[in-house]
């Protein structure tokens, strides 16, 4: 096959490209120029968009003897990832930009261009396993990236290859060393690529501006003022501008964010326990495939744990989410309702709920949805039905 190897400049994509070549495919290397901000592209910046990363990717391609190109998707990245990130925080959501980038850039923009140019597939260094259309977690549990691929469609997966998913990270580094790749010991990137200094609140403040509001406790009493709800996320404990502990001597956490009123509610850790989740913008979840109700496991963070749940797929006629975002006409007509069998802590609107089917050969990824509402956990059991759930905006 003729394939495009997406080369970030890291060790995983380098080995993925090498394995695709060794498998007999015709390979070209492509580095994506995504962010044009001076902070992101400067030499020495640790992200996936810096000049250093592009140079590292080119050196690997030269070592492999494959053609190398830089494709500029910066305008689309700004519109589909950065602006979406800012808009989501402005309405009190907590988005994951890596999922959005995978959905709109790496496996839409890149894949569409690749297919248009006559290529058959895109190769990446993600730690996930894909065989015959079935995606499983990567063998390396510490590096598994199936969660951030949960937004892909069946059509996109039909043109994807993940050559490193069957291998653990130390072996990938050894393989890169054997090939003489200079990136063999290059550290992994953990920061948001367009916020390489890690100062997310400052970045959002510049984009959104001051939107003062009140911080209240569980009984509605005002305890402080704030500059904007974008500076907070559900479950946050640090950076609240409050004494570390309340009058009861217990730590305080952000338990709710109401962007419409500018109110941030704080409470105790137990107030963060969630027993029910409602999600929309579904990917790969369809009653015709999975049935109206099924048992599963759900994960809500890239490196978070999983809990068992009962899932239901129900009609979703609503065109506006509780946070105020108008749904697009091409979005799934279904919504996902999850009754958790164990509580999850600090689940936020805007996060992805990725659903798996437990399997001895590796959990199978069924699909995902974007969380739009939660219901509290009850010590007597999970939350009530979706019809009984109060969304944060209604609580």
UniProtKB/Swiss-Prot annotation:
Disulfide bonds join 101-193. InterPro entries: MnmA-like, MnmA-like_C, MnmA-like_central, MnmA-like_central_sf, Rossmann-like_a/b/a_fold. Residues 143-145 are annotated as: Interaction with tRNA. It is found in: Cytoplasm. Keywords: ATP-binding, Cytoplasm, Disulfide bond, Nucleotide-binding, RNA-binding, Transferase, tRNA processing, tRNA-binding. Pfam families: tRNA_Me_trans (PF03054), tRNA_Me_trans_C (PF20258), tRNA_Me_trans_M (PF20259). It is an enzyme of class 2 (transferase). Catalyzes the 2-thiolation of uridine at the wobble position (U34) of tRNA, leading to the formation of s(2)U34. Belongs to the MnmA/TRMU family. This is tRNA-specific 2-thiouridylase MnmA. It comes from Corynebacterium jeikeium (strain K411).
């Amino acid at each position: 096959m003729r394939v495009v190897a997406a080369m970030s400049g890291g060790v995983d994509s380098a080995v993925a490209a090498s394995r695709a070549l060794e498998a007999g495919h015709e390979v070209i290397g492509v580095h994506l120029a995504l962010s044009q901000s001076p902070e992101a592209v400067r030499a020495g910046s640790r992200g996936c968009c810096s000049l250093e990363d592009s140079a590292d990717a080119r050196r690997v391609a030269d070592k492999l003897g494959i053609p190398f190109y830089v494709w500029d998707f910066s305008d689309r990245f700004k519109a589909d990832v950065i602006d979406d990130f800012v808009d989501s925080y402005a309405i009190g959501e907590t988005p994951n930009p890596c999922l959005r980038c995978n959905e709109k850039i790496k496996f839409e923009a890149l894949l569409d261009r690749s297919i248009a140019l006559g290529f058959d597939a895109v190769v990446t260094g993600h730690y996930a396993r894909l065989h015959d259309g079935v995606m499983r977690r990567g063998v390396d549990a510490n590096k598994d990236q199936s969660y951030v691929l949960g937004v892909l469609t069946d059509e996109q997966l039909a043109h994807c290859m993940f050559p490193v998913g069957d291998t653990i990270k130390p072996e990938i580094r050894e393989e890169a060393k054997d090939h003489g790749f200079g990136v063999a010991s290059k550290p992994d990137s953990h920061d948001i690529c367009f916020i390489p200094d890690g100062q997310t609140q400052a970045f959002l403040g510049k984009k959104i501006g001051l939107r003062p509001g009140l911080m209240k406790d569980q009984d509605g009493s005002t305890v402080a003022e704030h500059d904007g709800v974008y500076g907070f996320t559900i479950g946050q404990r640090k950076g609240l501008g409050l004494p570390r502990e309340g009058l009861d001597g217990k730590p305080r956490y952000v338990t709710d964010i109401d962007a419409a009123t500018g109110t941030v509610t704080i409470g105790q850790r137990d107030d963060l326990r969630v027993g029910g989740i409602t999600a929309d913008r579904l990917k790969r979840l369809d009653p015709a495939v999975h049935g109206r109700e099924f048992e599963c496991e759900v994960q809500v963070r890239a490196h978070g744990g999983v809990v068992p749940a009962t899932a239901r797929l129900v009609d979703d006629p609503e065109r506006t989410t509780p946070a105020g975002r108008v749904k697009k006409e091409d979005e799934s007509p279904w919504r996902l309702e999850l009754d958790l069998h164990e509580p999850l802590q600090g689940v936020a609107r805007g996060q992805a709920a990725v659903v798996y089917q437990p399997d001895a050969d590796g959990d199978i990824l069924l699909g995902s949805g974007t969380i739009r509402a939660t219901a509290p956990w009850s010590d007597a059991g999970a939350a009530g039905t979706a019809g009984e759930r109060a969304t944060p905006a209604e609580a």
